[in-house]
A protein has these predicted regions:
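Extracytoplasmic Gram-positive cell-surface binding/anchoring modules and repeats
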Residues: 54
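Bacterial N-terminal signal peptides
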Residues: 10-19
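Sec-dependent signal peptide cleavage junction
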Residues: 19-29
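Hydrophobic alpha-helical membrane context
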Residues: 17-18, 48, 119
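Active-site-proximal helix/loop segments of hydrolytic enzymes
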Residues: 28-32, 58-183
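Short glycine-rich His-centered loop
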Residues: 31-50
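Bacterial N-terminal signal peptides that target proteins for export
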Residues: 1-8
């Protein structure tokens, strides 16, 4: 559970870096955050020692939502409630339906061989979504590193069509929502 606390703290601080100067005063429009617990349903994600990525992302997402809801001026939604399959486009569409200011997609670097470690944050390679995603990711990575997690960096990746590689980033960018995918 120590890692969950670290991720939550880093996420909160990342929001501060991104929206710190513009978190609304009482009565103003709230900052709307969508948290996407990666995988779900039949899509287990990575598996190691009886743990599945879909369950770990949900545990952390629920804890993050509970913590963030304690703060005035922040509205939080989860893209999926419970263990169900959702396409990446459906997740981005859900965030858009809530008028999300930011979409945070949660994953874990894990493998049976234990050859994946540390954390990395993926953001859009394009426009304002890149700038806002990178701003969030910078604060996030700085804090995760201070907490002792190995920094694998802030990254972008393109597919063979020259678009953002990760579907959740591509679909959220198409809807004008800055996003970050943390591994």
């Amino acid at each position: 559970m120590k890692i969950i606390r670290k991720v939550m703290l880093a996420f909160l601080m990342g929001l501060f870096f991104l929206y710190g100067k513009s978190i609304p005063a009482h009565g103003a429009q709230p900052v709307v955050v969508a948290i996407d617990p990666g995988h779900g349903g039949e899509n287990l994600g990575a598996e190691c020692n009886g743990y599945t990525e879909k369950n770990l992302t949900m545990i952390v997402a629920l804890a993050m939502k509970e913590e963030l809801e304690k703060y005035e001026g922040i509205e939080v939604y989860l893209t999926r409630e419970g263990d169900k399959d959702m396409s990446l486009e459906e997740r981005a569409e859900f965030a858009a339906s809530k008028n999300a200011d930011f979409l945070f997609c949660l994953h874990f670097n894990m493998s049976a061989e234990h050859d994946l470690f540390g954390s990395e944050v993926w953001v859009s390679a394009f426009g304002e979504e890149h700038q806002e995603g990178y701003s969030f990711a910078s604060g996030e990575m700085e804090l995760l590193e201070e907490m002792g997690l190995y920094p694998r960096g802030i990254k972008t990746r393109l597919n063979d069509r020259g678009e953002d590689y990760y579907g959740i980033i591509r679909h959220s960018t198409a809807r004008g929502i800055p996003s970050a995918l943390i591994e």
